[in-house]
């Protein structure tokens, strides 16, 4: 099948199921662990103290339930390739248009931020290289890899995620040895008692604990990426449930395990919020080049986020085009079943975004990324609402689906209540309040564009 297809047979094309079980398992881990754990955890610990562990536990449970609802929806119809497909089915064309372009915008802004970060992290070793050069090189490499086959995307994510896993496991193992041996640091003896002997588990009270959710929730952004791979996964009925069901264990091990060890080695009030706690732990045991090691991990983590962005934005535009919510040329596939036009389009927009990042005032760029994180809450919420509609209108499908969201509809309302709570927290925090009130402008813009397009076609 060639690229020169007519509009009539575009919809007959399908993406290739080239992602294997090992790819999906590591993509699930990579989606749940961002650069925030390595760089931003010092700030979140400083904010909430040991109570941050409970915030991660609660948010991890909610994200697991969101993923269960997403998994049930995707496996109810194997023709679903993304959020757009089931939103189209259950909430209509306008909701699908808004959801698809919102998710696309979310990942475009993530790519802008992380490509900029790639330049910054590279300058740690090569200070003379202009910041834009490593970012541009990274984008070109990722684009070439994604243009080849979906399997190459999976391979990249597999190794990127593996680097993160090794770094976290190294921290936990080294940390546990330090704790059980009573290792002395400049701050005292490493011990689990450090968790409660410096003001208790809630040293900043409920106020600090509640405000910490703004950082914790954003750490889980991207966890839903597994859902976007369903249409390109071998044997999705077995692989997707396995990846989703492992989320609680991974959250417990990687987030809670790492932070628990860090706060046992160093009392929470000693940890420098502007430094990586990982570097502090590795330096304490005399690991040479600890900062370079973590810089490498964070660099690959940022590259992983960019890779996910290139993949997810192209697949979202492809899905939108299949439903006539984007130019039909974006639905064309190459002989290797890759949406080449959609990939080029998203890569060009990412490149423009990175260029604008150097021109725009810093506050504008920060506002854009803040708006995108608020939009992720919308994506999670719309998924849960679609799940409720599916259960209500397609009970026969729900009966035969082996992968169900537990305790429906209680868990649906629990998720929506939690997301509403996070929005309230965002309104309380000064640095996120503006983005919360500006975000509706994005949705109004999409509604206007949709209405104009519809009127034009009629």
UniProtKB/Swiss-Prot annotation:
GO cellular component terms, semicolon-separated: plasma membrane
Q: What is this protein called?
A: Uncharacterized transporter YdgF
> Function, please?
Probable amino-acid or metabolite transport protein.
Q: Which domain of life is it from?
A: Bacteria
Spans traversing the lipid bilayer: 26-46, 47-67, 95-115, 125-145, 160-180, 208-228, 251-271, 278-298, 342-362, 365-385, 409-429, 432-452
BP-aspect Gene Ontology terms? amino acid transport; transmembrane transport
InterPro entries, per database record:
AA-permease/SLC12A_dom, Amino_acid_permease_CS
Q: Where in the cell is it found?
A: Cell membrane
Source organism of the structure = Bacillus subtilis (strain 168)
What is its membrane topology?
Answer: Multi-pass membrane protein
Which family, according to the similarity comment? Belongs to the amino acid-polyamine-organocation (APC) superfamily.
Keywords, in A-Z order: Amino-acid transport, Cell membrane, Membrane, Transmembrane, Transmembrane helix, Transport
């Amino acid at each position: 099948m060639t690229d020169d297809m007519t509009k009539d047979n575009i919809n007959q094309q399908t993406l290739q199921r080239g992602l294997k079980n090992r790819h999906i398992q590591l993509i699930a881990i990579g989606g749940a662990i961002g650069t925030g754990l390595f760089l931003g955890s010092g700030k979140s610990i400083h904010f909430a103290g040991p109570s941050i562990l409970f915030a991660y536990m609660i948010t991890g449970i909610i994200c697991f339930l969101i993923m269960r609802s997403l998994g049930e929806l995707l496996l109810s119809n194997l023709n679903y390739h993304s959020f757009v497909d089931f939103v189209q089915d259950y909430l209509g064309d306008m909701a699908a248009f808004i959801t698809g372009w919102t998710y696309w915008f979310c990942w475009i802004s993530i790519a802008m931020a992380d490509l900029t970060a790639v330049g910054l992290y590279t300058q740690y070793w090569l200070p003379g290289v202009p910041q834009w050069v490593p970012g541009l090189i990274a984008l070109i490499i990722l684009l070439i890899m994604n243009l080849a086959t979906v399997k190459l995307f999976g391979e990249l994510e597999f190794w990127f995620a593996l680097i993160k896993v090794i770094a976290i496991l190294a921290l936990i193992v080294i940390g546990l040895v330090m704790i059980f041996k009573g290792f002395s640091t400049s701050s005292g003896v490493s011990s689990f008692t450090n968790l409660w002997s410096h003001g208790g588990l809630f040293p900043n009270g409920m106020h600090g604990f509640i405000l910490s959710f703004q950082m914790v929730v954003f750490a889980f952004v991207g966890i839903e990426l597994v859902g976007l791979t369903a249409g390109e996964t071998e044997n999705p009925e077995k692989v997707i449930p396995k990846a989703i069901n492992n989320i609680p264990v991974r959250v417990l091990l990687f987030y809670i395990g790492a932070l628990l060890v860090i706060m046992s080695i160093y009392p929470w009030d000693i940890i420098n919020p502007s430094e990586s706690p990982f570097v502090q732990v590795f330096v304490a045991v005399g690991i040479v080049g600890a900062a370079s090691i973590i810089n490498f991990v964070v660099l690959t983590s940022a590259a992983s986020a960019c890779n996910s962005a290139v993949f997810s934005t192209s697949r979202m535009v492809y899905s939108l085009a299949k439903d006539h919510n984007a130019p039909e040329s974006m639905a064309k596939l190459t002989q290797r079943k890759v949406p080449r036009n959609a990939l080029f389009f998203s890569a060009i927009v990412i490149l423009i975004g990175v260029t604008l990042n150097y021109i725009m005032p810093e506050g504008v760029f920060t506002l854009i990324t803040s708006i995108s994180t608020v939009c992720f809450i919308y994506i999670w919420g719309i998924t849960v609402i679609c799940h409720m509609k599916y259960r209500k209108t397609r009970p026969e499908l729900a009966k035969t689906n082996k992968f169900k969201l537990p305790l429906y509809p209680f868990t649906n309302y629990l998720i929506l209540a939690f997301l509403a709570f996070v929005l309230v927290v965002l309104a309380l925090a000064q640095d996120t309040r503006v983005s919360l009130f500006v975000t509706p402008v994005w949705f109004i813009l999409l509604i206007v564009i949709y209405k104009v397009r519809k009127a034009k076609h009629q």
